[in-house]
Design a protein with these regions (language model features):
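Positively charged n-region of N-terminal signal peptides that target proteins for export
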Residues: 1-4, 18
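Extended lipid/amphipathic-ligand handling interfaces
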Residues: 33, 58-62, 194-196
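Sec-dependent N-terminal signal peptides
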Residues: 4-13
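Gly/Pro-enriched, hydrophobic low-complexity segments
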Residues: 144-242
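N-terminal leader/targeting segments and the immediate start of mature chains
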Residues: 15-53
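Flexible, processing/modification-adjacent segments and terminal tails
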Residues: 21-25, 90-157, 181-184, 238, ...
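Short, hydrophobic/aromatic-rich segments at coil-to-beta transitions
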Residues: 42-48, 63-69, 140-147, 174-176, ...
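Mid-chain, structured segments of secreted extracytoplasmic proteins
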Residues: 68-103
Length: 246
């Protein structure tokens, strides 16, 4: 009996050690992160929410998605509609004629808000390239650090931007993200997720949005800068009145 007990304890310790040393690819980590955030529940659902002074609506996923933004402008109702093939703006129900550059700016603005709200779901899009980097410790917790770049084909207007995601090793939840951008002089942003809530099985978070205090910060070392307190809070990204309909 004593030998059996010792064998049982040994097997248990071995199992824990193997689990602790279990390794995953970038794809496997992202798949788990998407799964814990709602997975296929994103498909074919109608999602609406308020962000700042605008109302957003999305129906469908991927190439079949229709993304909307509705807001008041000087007493007039503005409705922006982005689909796979076009972008349209209606003002009080009348279609506006827009220059291509203006339409592209509006299109990107609508897409960006919807994209961040649904993260990490979009990380399995065909144009996304994922690389697993060295694991890091942030605020006492261990994280997988994943670098994301985009192919020019299918990567959108901002395909040259680079993203980093910090996915918790225990929960597989995306707690931090960062990205660089090249418009308006360029820069780097670092976001910390908070106020997690699940609505009909889908995970939603708000973000604290940070920027570097000096020019020595890059997207590669932004996590170390955050750990040292060398970032400053720029804004908060808060979602309100979230609704999920199947």
């Amino acid at each position: 009996m004593k030998k059996m007990f010792i064998l049982f304890v040994f097997c248990g310790l071995l199992s824990c050690k193997e689990k602790k040393n279990e390794s995953f690819t970038a794809q496997q980590i992202v798949d788990k992160a998407i799964g814990i955030s709602g997975g296929d529940l994103f498909v074919d659902c109608k999602l609406s929410f308020d962000f700042r002074d605008k109302h957003y609506i999305s129906e469908g996923i991927g190439n079949n998605a229709v993304l909307k933004r509705v807001f008041d402008l000087e007493g007039k109702k503005v409705e922006d509609i982005k689909s796979k093939s076009k972008f349209e703006r209606y003002v009080d129900g009348t279609l506006e004629v827009l220059q291509d550059t203006v339409a592209n700016n509006y299109d990107n603005s609508v897409n960006s808000v919807h994209y961040f709200v649904k993260l990490p779901y979009g990380l399995n899009d065909p144009a996304v390239n994922k690389t697993l980097l060295k694991e890091v410790n942030l605020k006492g917790k261990e994280y997988y650090k994943i670098k994301v770049t985009f192919d020019q084909k299918g990567g959108g207007e901002d395909f040259e931007d680079t993203y980093f995601y910090w996915i918790n090793k225990e929960s597989f939840k995306t707690d931090y993200l960062a990205y660089d951008f090249h418009v308006d002089g360029g820069g780097v942003r670092f976001r910390k997720a908070y106020n997690e809530r699940y609505i009909k099985g889908i995970r939603f978070v708000d973000y604290e949005n940070y920027q570097p205090k000096d020019s020595t910060s890059t997207i590669e070392n932004i996590d170390a800068k955050f750990e040292l307190g060398d970032l400053e809070l720029l804004s908060k990204i808060e979602l309100k009145n979230i609704s999920v309909q199947k």
